[in-house]
Amino acid sequence: MTNIRKSHPLIKIVNDAFIDLPAPSNISSWWNFGSLLGVCLIVQILTGLFLAMHYTSDTATAFNSVTHICRDVNYGWLLRYLHANGASMFFICLYLHIGRGLYYGSYTYTETWNVGVILLFAVMATAFMGYVLPWGQMSFWGATVITNLLSAIPYIGTELVQWIWGGLSVDKATLT
């Protein structure tokens, strides 16, 4: 009798990708963080999409919409906590993934390493844009904290921050 994980068409896909993965037997658990990054990213996108369906960014109703998500939406509290903690887990996995690459000397593969550096910059830019979305779903505090380092640049710091903010539109508790 054959094993169901090798005969069933759908389970066979999962088996080939996770269980019978053609990888060396001496591979360590440090090599899981790339896959964990993908899982964290999918969780962030899905929970963010569902949270955005219920959130309002107006200063008068933003807090009420968050309490509505936590109290009235089915498992809304779970969506909120998964989204908040998923962002932290994403960056923890990202830095551990980079640390594993440094430890095992992956920087010697310059083309692959340079693509990873570009992806790191893209992740940082995406995280920033997620905080200062044109929709107005981020706080004045978030925009100022993230861009605060740029304001320390002599002569052009203040103008650079205003340019990144898109002018003087950052002025309320939420960016609407």
From Swiss-Prot:
The keyword Thylakoid does not apply. The chain crosses the membrane at residues 33-53, 77-98, 113-133. One of its GO terms (molecular function) is ubiquinol-cytochrome-c reductase activity. Heme b b562 binds at residue 83. This is Cytochrome b. The gene is MT-CYB. It comes from the Eukaryota. Keywords: Electron transport, Heme, Iron, Membrane, Metal-binding, Mitochondrion, Mitochondrion inner membrane, Respiratory chain, Transmembrane, Transmembrane helix, Transport, Ubiquinone. It comes from Nyctinomops aurispinosus. Belongs to the cytochrome b family. Its cofactor is heme b. One of its GO terms (cellular component) is mitochondrial inner membrane. The cytochrome bc1 complex contains 11 subunits: 3 respiratory subunits (MT-CYB, CYC1 and UQCRFS1), 2 core proteins (UQCRC1 and UQCRC2) and 6 low-molecular weight proteins (UQCRH/QCR6, UQCRB/QCR7, UQCRQ/QCR8, UQCR10/QCR9, UQCR11/QCR10 and a cleavage product of UQCRFS1). This cytochrome bc1 complex then forms a dimer.
